[in-house]
Amino acid sequence: MLEIMSEHQDSLLKCKAETLPSERRKRTVEDFNKFCSFVLAYANYIPSQKEEGPWSPASSSSPNGSGASGEGSVLGGASSNMSPSWNHGTSDLHTIHTFVHKARANKSSKSMRRLSPDGALEDNMCLKDSFYESQAASKAERKKDKKLKRLSLGSGAGDSSSSGGEKRARIKHSKNSKQSKAYKKLKSSAHSESDSENGLGHREERSEHRLQVQVKEEKNEEDEEEAIREADMSSSEGETWIADEDIMVESGDDSWDLITCYCGKPFAGRPMIECSQCNVWVHLSCAKIKKSNVPDIFNCHKCRDSRRSSHKKDS
């Protein structure tokens, strides 16, 4: 039993010795240089080093050089490899410095290229200026369109207001249109004759004489037309006066200033009608009666009111 127990303890000790981890490896200058070169290559500052092998962890050694008895060989190998690693580390530092200088130079050249790629900044500024100019032009066009709309609206209102004035002007100038047209025709004929012929003196006098004669004839014709119109108007007025003789009061000296209407105004030659009940003469305008629609029986408003009041009392 004791032998079995001792064997079991020996096996446990062997397992523990095998499973015990070695001391944690410490970073060296070579590892730092490799790490820096890897970072620079990853950032595209330096070209990637394909000729170098993968980064393999080298055997490390404690700085004191003391360790367990079972690990003596490992420590011895690490101490033997220290001197070449330091030499290689100094060369790697030199290469890192050169790579950093190259990277800075490349960086500055790239920045210069970015700053001036065939006048890109000038092109951008020109594009911005053209964009702002197009915006200003569009704003100016909008303002012009608004002004044109306002002017069109104002002209429409002016046309609507001036249409009435044009109609009135046409009515006013319709009487003198014949004279002006005839006078213009005579002037044009006289000018054409005077320009076509050589003897200007006698012919101008003749043309002026003709113009005067024609103007006089036209005036006489117009006077005759006006007289005919006045005669027609007087005849029509006479007919109306004849039709109104039964309605109107006789126009004597006393009856002209006679006041019989409720409005308190005199007769003054205006047409009147007599009430069939109270025999009071009332102006047709006060009774609101047209000359064309004169009734045979007329009752003034006072007689109408008295009738209505009597009917109400009876009811």
Curated annotation (Swiss-Prot):
Residues 169-188 have a biased composition (Basic residues). One of its GO terms (biological process) is negative regulation of autophagosome maturation. Transmembrane segments: none annotated. Residues 190-219 have a biased composition (Basic and acidic residues). Gene3D superfamilies: Zinc/RING finger domain, C3HC4 (zinc finger) (3.30.40.10). Keywords: Autophagy, Cytoplasm, Metal-binding, Nucleus, Zinc, Zinc-finger. Signal peptide: none annotated. A zinc finger (PHD-type) spans 258-306. SMART domains: PHD. GO terms for molecular function: zinc ion binding. It is found in: Nucleus; Cytoplasm. Belongs to the PHF23 family. This is PHD finger protein 23B. It comes from Danio rerio.
